[in-house]
Amino acid sequence: MYKSYSMELAGRTLTVDIGRVAKQANGAALMHYGDTTVLATATASKEPREGIDFFPLSVEYEEKMYAVGKIPGGFNKREGKASEHAILTSRVIDRPMRPLFPKDYRNDVTLVDMVMSVDPECNPEIPAMLGSSIATCISDIPFDGPCATTQVGLIDGEFIINPTLAQKDMSDLQLTVASTRDKVIMIEAGANEVPEAKMIEAIYKAHEVNQEIIKFIDKIVAECGKEKHTYQSCAVPEELFAAIKEIVPPEEMEVAVFSDDKQTRENNVAQVTEKLKEAFADKEEWLAVLGEAVYQYQKKTVRKMILKDHKRPDGRAIKQIRPLAAEVDIIPRVHGSAMFTRGQTQICTVTTLAPLAEAQRLDGLDEFETSKRYMHHYNFPSYSVGETKPSRGPGRREIGHGALAERALVPVLPSEEEFPYAIRTVSETFESNGSTSQASICASTMSLEAAGVPIKKPVAGISCGLVTGDTDDDYIVLTDIQGLEDFFGDMDFKVAGTHDGITAIQMDIKIHGLTRQIVEEAIARTKEAREYILTEVIEKCIPGPRPSVGAYAPKIIQIQIDPQKIGDVVGQRGKTINTIIERTGVKIDITDEGAVSICGVDAKSMEEAKKMIEIIATDFEQGQIFTGRVISIKEFGAFVEFAPGKEGMVHISKICKERINRVEDVLTLGDKVTVICLGKDKMGRMSFSIKDVPEEARK
């Protein structure tokens, strides 16, 4: 017999079935939220993985197309690699869970959330996030949970808890907050310039809901939870730390890590490591964990410098931003480019414009999101950190960073009506020493403006870090963290926005949560830094969007036709529209409402295509004059094509003012002629005349 538990959550019923399915996993919960069903499982290996110095956690959010009554596309007709949305959801599930596992745990842990049914009223991300927490809490896997997750929307100034898919589409805020019993442990947000005070209010609205969910989870764990298993700790032996300090005193390690140059610091630490290897040459068991021991020693040293001495590794003040530089148009012939440098972090972003037909098509579980006109892609090559690795395409980190920058910029993009382009920005990481995702937001803003994209306002991003002591009041918030402060600190709090509000947040931490005081201070600190970057760097580099797109960017003409004429313009099996495209070299996109976009580089070709479409879509009246081409000659006259798929007949008597015996004496195939419309003949064909064209129209 299985056990079932239910609670009301945001006006819908959340039901959790324990012991019903997947009983061979360490923990499993079949989650029902409305008609949305997600199977969440937690499984751990029986033995630790050898030779690693990290906790091997993997999270898989699996979207099954049968959940929305679809058969997957493609040749194989089955689910393939994870979609971008699935990867991003996996990361959101991972981030609040990871800090709650023991730091010295080395057993492989896999969390799988399989979406089996989707109710548009109940977002599957919610039961997936809660299911992972419940499955892990009731398992025998060591875990300091529970944690709970809630989403918040903002419509007409009112907060919506766990908004439906339709509500998310119209919301000014898409916020996800995870909490432990007392503290916030993860924040992810996309927002339409939401003020800082409103954002904090929304975060703690979600935190309140999370406390009710945690009580619900506690009840399940009390009745169904297994005893946590003991595990082999992989912590560095204390006697090794003591021996290291004898050879390399704390003052010497401080000197090694204190530098504003990343490579100098890394070389200093490498020399310390070599010194220790020589000293411990006869202690194989210590050599096996020496790398982790040196890492931990660096960490303790840096944290002590910051927390006790208020001294950062590169000598900056606690609120000081690294040196900034910005420039645009650094790459010729592309549609727009910009480079943003912050200390030893450097990003170049290139913008490409294309017709709306080239927008990315999405085939996922969200019926309200079928395409994406703005794409931001982030690349992180190994040379940016001085390493050698083969390039194997974007990983989860690159996809996550790209999505964060994309989310930050979407609120300021012009509408399709204002700017009928698909837009792609690609951020290339030239150099990395922390906060590359935020630098890519700054570079993308300038690149879009340089490309002539009329964004409403510039956007900048900055990240704050944190070092905590033994009590909640013992902490230091750091503005603009570099790589070392990210690795050894407790928080990476990224915030992007305009002068008027926040457009994106992503908060990752390595501790068990943040107090409200820290959250408020971090948000205030990022606002201060963001204002500085916008005013002193971005707006001085490029004051606003260029008045038009660049010389090498495609131009777009828009016209409106009667929707009932769309079939005439397209033609049978696309023959007419393809002929226009072949003749002019332009790209054409037509919406169901009759909005036609003509895209090309050559203005003359675009105008020619526009004329053709207007002629095809027009109901002809007597007296209209056209220019066409002779496509057929008969004894009784000639047929003239005046637009692809559109033709009319010129009777032999209407060719010349003088009488002629043979059409061929005057016209040949391919001749370009000007004709005037006489109406329709008895057979319903367009009837033209060449001889009746006014003299001024012939010129």
Language-model features and meaning:
Residues 1-232:
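Long, basic N-terminal domains or extensions that often function
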Residues 1-45, 229-369, 554-568, 576, ...:
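Extended amphipathic alpha-helical scaffolds
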Residues 25-109, 115-117, 121-122, 188, ...:
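Glycine-rich, flexible beta-strand/loop modules in the N-terminal catalytic cores of phosphate-handling
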Residues 27-29, 122-141, 328-351, 433-453, ...:
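Conserved phosphate/anionic-ligand binding catalytic regions in large, soluble enzymes, centered on
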Residues 103-109, 144-146, 213-231, 263, ...:
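Flexible, glycine/charged-enriched surface loops at secondary-structure junctions
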Residues 140-257, 448-547:
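Mobile "lid/hinge" segments at catalytic clefts and subdomain interfaces of large enzymes
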Residues 231-241, 532-559, 607-627:
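Long, charged amphipathic helices and adjacent flexible linkers at domain junctions
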Residues 552-556, 563-699:
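Single-stranded RNA-binding regions, centering on S1/OB-family and related RNA-binding modules
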